[in-house]
């Protein structure tokens, strides 16, 4: 997503 939702950030940062 362009504007990463909290859960998406977790997926990105927690990759």
From Swiss-Prot:
It is an enzyme of class 1 (oxidoreductase). It is found in: Mitochondrion matrix. Keywords: Mitochondrion, NAD, Oxidoreductase, Tricarboxylic acid cycle. Belongs to the LDH/MDH superfamily. MDH type 1 family. Disulfide bonds: none annotated. The keyword Transcription does not apply. GO terms for biological process: tricarboxylic acid cycle. Homodimer. It catalyses: (S)-malate + NAD(+) = oxaloacetate + NADH + H(+). The lineage of its organism: Eukaryota, Viridiplantae, Streptophyta, Embryophyta, Tracheophyta. This is Malate dehydrogenase, mitochondrial. Its EC number is 1.1.1.37. One of its GO terms (molecular function) is L-malate dehydrogenase (NAD+) activity. The keyword NAD applies. GO terms for cellular component: mitochondrial matrix. It comes from the Eukaryota.
């Amino acid at each position: 997503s362009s504007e990463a939702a909290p859960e998406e950030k977790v997926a990105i940062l927690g990759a």
